[in-house]
């Protein structure tokens, strides 16, 4: 049951961090949408007339009574908290009771609302947030808030605002974030009374994300939910939706989003954990698609630190970083329980159509049910392993699959071993020498501008090109870069003939890696062809009589 609106006592007001001043069209949208979500709305309509500085937000939430309408625009009036202790167990998006009061100070504000079986009421508020006379109007249960002439009495503030296009882009991002955090809501947004943005509801964020990123398809995603217990013995959940790195990546980190308890937040520490988990799975200078939503006990979070409640202090930060990395590792695996089985990849359909026209085999994408069921059956051009599976077949490029295996072994154990005979390198610069020493190699002077390398990564010890490999390692990069270079040089070369046993061993090792989808450079390792796709290509659903023209 919703509490009535009341003005907070002074001892609670004194503890509340200063609320954010209404400083843009987006700030108005944010405050009104938060109120709508807190009211339990599952349909929100927004109408923006940016040139007229007008915004209207309508919802089908619980609505307000006549008494609430008379109090809602006073400073620190709220139904969401009552006392000091409530500040440490906040479950709503808003709690300070300042939104409507702040808006009334800089715009013309009117609110129409209806609660339960009450009659709908309409009220206009002055710039102090004081209500005028209430009028009865016919309205469905819910609330309609109209804000007009925003900053009309503050022309200097209007002139200092970003361009209208920039403000609209910020509003679009804001609505995207709300939609991801609250997927059950239907969104309809108008600009100057024209359709601008529509988002249909979904069971979770994986059904919302493809509506927001046009280049993203449902089958490009993996999602999972993990229930866990925090170090404080509290129940919590990680909800994760990621773009599979062998299918989708971005030029910038614009779709790495983090939410906590229904609110999008900024956290450089959690973002760093996400980037660490995706390291060496996406190509260089590319970024992952990732939506992370933490559902925590409200006592684990302090929302009362930032005016927009966008920055938080999270208890047990190191624990959460470790759990996030672990969850992403799990989602990046080949376990198909985190991959939708029924959704047909649009790109696969296009490939199948083209293949049928050209009478050639086609390639689709789908993960197996059991990573242990791949069986090596052949090798193509001494480059690709053909692996049979109960649901079709896979093509695996042998070099980059082996590279992934070796890279993860080097990550776990960067082993440097002594050389029986030192390798002599000439003309090394001081920077190259320091780089090899940083990697743990033993180096000694060996005459004029020559150096004796007395140790080497174990994978390179028996290679004939180990001197070239050492020169490559000396040219820079961190330890991870050196591990990638070593794995690449040491992996089975394309053009190498493999026996069935060798191919099977490689498949088994590769399937057990943490990130089997891409090589350390971000290239996809495998392609799959489903038996159902083969059946469609060969028209196996035809009736025998029809196929003979009977």
UniProtKB/Swiss-Prot annotation:
- Organism superkingdom: Bacteria
- Name one molecular function that GO assigns to this entry: ATP-dependent DNA damage sensor activity
In terms of Gene3D superfamilies, this protein maps to: 3.30.230.10, Histidine kinase-like ATPase, C-terminal domain, MutL, C-terminal domain, dimerisation subdomain, MutL, C-terminal domain, regulatory subdomain
What Pfam family does this protein match (any one)? DNA_mis_repair
List this protein's GO terms for biological process. mismatch repair
Q: Which GO terms describe its cellular component?
A: mismatch repair complex
Q: Supply the alphabetized keyword list.
A: DNA damage, DNA repair
Q: Which family does it belong to?
A: Belongs to the DNA mismatch repair MutL/HexB family.
Quote the HAMAP family the UniProt record gives.
Answer: DNA_mis_repair (MF_00149)
**Biological role stated in the UniProt entry:** This protein is involved in the repair of mismatches in DNA. It is required for dam-dependent methyl-directed DNA mismatch repair. May act as a 'molecular matchmaker', a protein that promotes the formation of a stable complex between two or more DNA-binding proteins in an ATP-dependent manner without itself being part of a final effector complex.
The protein, known as = DNA mismatch repair protein MutL
